[in-house]
Amino acid sequence: MTSQQREKELLPVRVPIFKGLYGWRLLVTTQNKLNSFSSMNSLSDFKQVHFIQGHDWPDTQILLDSGLPVVTSIEYSSLFNMLIKGRGDVFPRSLLEVEMELNTFKDDAGENLTVVPHLMLQYPTAIYFFFSKDNPEIAQAVEKGLAIMRNNGEFDRLFNAYYRSAIEHADIKNKIIIRLENKNLPLLTPLDNTSLWFSEKDM
């Protein structure tokens, strides 16, 4: 995931290869806490909800900057166990990750893990190809190749082949989207080029 520090150290090709989908977050919780989310529909409703995140993930700072309580662990494998054991209330997961993760942790949780059906978070973020600043010619070659793929439709064809099912399964059109600011997003992020990003209009 891009950040101001990462773009200082490395050379990014600013084409978000997942079209920003890692910033579209479904809310994983437990069955016994699901009802507590039923009346929530705005950011202010989450001020007493404890979000589970990785200790040094960029997402953690995004939540903190939005005034949301966060509990963390340095071990990815322990994050779902924290949720199952009630050490946090909700674990936001990318819509690209959530189905696989729920299946992976089903044996530990039984049927206890679920997704809040009417809410999701969204914040701008990008995953790029990064290269050493000592090798700009490689970055230029990749940038040129991606431009060709975008112009001839191959980029979108591959994107839809791999990710359309997850997008549809997320049922975005029937969710309230809580939008957060990403204060660590570099100024050169091409947010104005809407063709690079997924949006609800693509449903």
PLM regions with names:
Residues 1-45:
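Acidic, polar ligand-binding/catalytic clefts
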Residues 1-10, 92-112:
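A ligand-binding cleft/hinge motif common to bilobed small-molecule-binding domains
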Residues 20-26, 107-143, 165-189, 197-200:
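Periplasmic-binding protein-like
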Residues 27-67, 79, 96:
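Bilobed "Venus flytrap"/periplasmic-binding protein-like clamshell domains
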Residues 50-57, 73-77, 92, 132-140, ...:
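Soluble non-cytosolic domains of exported or imported proteins
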Residues 54-66, 146-203:
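Ligand-binding clefts/hinges and TM-proximal coupling segments of bilobed small-molecule sensing domains
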Residues 63, 83-84, 129, 142:
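Hydrophobic residues within well-ordered alpha-helices
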Residues 71-85:
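Short helix-initiation/N-cap motifs at beta->coil->alpha
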